[in-house]
């Protein structure tokens, strides 16, 4: 049985201060560019990718204002977007920068939506719990 999901997000291990969620792929790549961790040719490639997205993907006002939101691509309408983002994922892999591809049908409370993406509100709360006893071999 194939699983189908409505939304996808690429994020890293780094936690964004304003959301307490993993930084998104654009944040991760820009940080690598700013920290000179990419060769110039690769930095230029990412800048081209980012420019393409700036031209083709609306920028949610909540993101412009650095509000605590997380953006997700819509899987059904974003084939071209996801094709373009694969090159940025390749750059992360080339520089051994870990990332996760997360799929969901429930990204949270949607505060912005366009043809290609949604932005969801985050509450700024990160819940950390102990493992349940069963994970320690106890019954």
Which role fits each region the language model picked out?
Residues 1-77:
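Long, contiguous N-terminal structural blocks used for assembly/anchoring
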Residues 58-111:
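Short glycine-rich, low-complexity/disordered patches
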Residues 5-7, 22, 82, 115, ...:
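Low-complexity, intrinsically disordered short peptide segments enriched in small/polar/basic residues
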Residues 90, 94-139:
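Acidic, proline/glycine-rich low-complexity IDRs
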Residues 17-20, 45, 57, 82, ...:
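Generic detector of leucine side chains in alpha-helical contexts
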């Amino acid at each position: 049985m194939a699983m189908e999901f409505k939304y996808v997000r690429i994020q890293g291990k780094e936690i964004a201060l304003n959301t307490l969620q993993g930084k998104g792929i654009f944040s991760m790549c820009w940080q690598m560019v700013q920290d000179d961790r990419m060769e110039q040719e690769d930095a230029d490639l990412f800048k081209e990718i980012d420019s393409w997205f700036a031209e083709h993907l609306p920028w949610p006002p909540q993101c412009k204002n650095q509000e605590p939101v997380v953006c997700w691509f819509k899987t059904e309408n974003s084939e071209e977007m996801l094709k373009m983002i694969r090159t940025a994922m390749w750059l992360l892999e080339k520089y051994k920068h870990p990332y996760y591809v997360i799929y969901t049908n429930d990204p949270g409370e949607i505060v912005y939506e366009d043809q290609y993406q949604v932005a969801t509100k985050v509450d700024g709360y990160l819940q950390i719990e102990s493992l349940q006893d069963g994970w320690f071999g106890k019954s």
